[in-house]
């Protein structure tokens, strides 16, 4: 790994965020460093980067057919790394704005779909034959709207959820694996389904020393989650995240049945998902 890649990777990690955010940022940093190396540009640290280096990388990615949304995300990563390195002026420069780079204006409409119940049960059955603990995590992701990392780390919260449900709680606390490490509360939209999923997971974890996915670290557990779910059929428009899309639709219906307007239901669901109440329009577009 080049000195620039090492420097950018260190800054990418230091900038914080979820496991996936940091991982994606580190991968982008290595691609960027390889691009400069291939162009024989002698830059060894982030402090030496110039706007033309960044523009050249984005233009090459455009020529490769990479989507505008992906490149917008990559530029957000570049800016966070620059800011972490103290290069705030460059990170906010008009020279590397999305518009200047020709990557503005992409639609935020979702490219994935909510998983249909029939497909979900097929996948759940396949996964159960492979690993009951993985199936339990998958089931909790569907009935609670958990992100992948939240589902993988949920074994640490099973007893808490069981106690909260026993006390009649309408909302459950999601603490581990959340994006940016920000705890959130999620609405119980189907009490019996959630109660049953938590009980099943507790029984399995009780036989596995408290674990659902028995891997030595988070990275290998996440790889196990993604690889086996892909093999079981969660791929393309029905990615593992389609479980969360399906839960979001359930939540919107639940809130509307409670008397909330559509706009209020979107805002409440956005909060449950960990996006905040100001992103109702985003939820409607993406979910």
List the model feature ranges, each with a label:
Residues 189-251:
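Active-site/catalytic core of tyrosine-dependent DNA strand-transfer enzymes
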Residues 9-108:
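N-terminal core-binding DNA-recognition domain of tyrosine recombinases/integrases
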Residues 159-162, 274-282:
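Short, basic interhelical loop/turn and adjoining N-cap
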Residues 117-148:
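Basic, Lys/Arg- and aromatic-enriched nucleic-acid-binding interface segment
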Residues 104-122, 180-192:
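DNA breakage-rejoining catalytic core of tyrosine-based enzymes
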Residues 139, 244-277:
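C-terminal catalytic core of tyrosine-transesterase DNA break-rejoin enzymes
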Residues 153-194:
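Conserved tyrosine-mediated DNA breakage-rejoining catalytic core shared by Y-recombinases
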Residues 25, 120, 133-135, 222, ...:
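Short, leucine-enriched amphipathic alpha-helices that occur as contiguous helical runs
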């Amino acid at each position: 790994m080049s000195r620039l890649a090492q420097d950018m990777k260190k800054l990418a990690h230091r900038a914080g965020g979820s496991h996936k955010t940091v991982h994606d940022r580190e991968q982008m940093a290595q691609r960027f460093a390889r691009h400069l190396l291939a162009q024989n540009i002698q830059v060894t640290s982030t402090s030496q980067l110039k706007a033309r280096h960044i523009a050249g990388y984005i233009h090459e990615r455009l020529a490769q057919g990479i989507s505008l949304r992906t490149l917008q995300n990559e530029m957000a990563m570049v800016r966070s790394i620059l800011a972490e390195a103290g290069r705030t002026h460059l990170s906010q420069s008009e020279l590397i704005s999305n518009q200047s780079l020709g990557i503005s204006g992409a639609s935020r409409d979702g490219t994935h779909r909510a998983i249909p119940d029939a497909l979900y049960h097929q996948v759940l059955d396949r996964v159960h034959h492979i690993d009951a603990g993985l199936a339990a995590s998958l089931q909790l992701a569907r009935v609670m709207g958990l992100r992948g990392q939240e589902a993988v780390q949920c074994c640490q919260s099973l007893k808490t959820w069981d106690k909260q449900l026993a006390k009649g709680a309408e909302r459950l606390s999601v603490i581990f694996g959340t994006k940016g490490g920000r705890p959130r509360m999620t609405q119980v939209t189907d009490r019996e389904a959630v109660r049953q999923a938590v009980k099943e997971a507790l029984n399995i974890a009780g036989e596995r020393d408290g674990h659902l996915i028995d891997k030595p670290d988070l990275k290998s557990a996440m790889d196990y989650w993604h690889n086996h779910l892909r093999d079981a059929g969660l791929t393309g428009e029905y990615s593992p995240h389609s479980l969360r899309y399906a839960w979001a639709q359930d939540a919107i219906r639940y809130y509307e049945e409670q008397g909330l307007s559509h706009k209020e239901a979107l805002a409440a669901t956005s909060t449950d998902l960990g996006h905040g109440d100001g992103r109702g329009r985003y939820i409607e577009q993406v979910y």
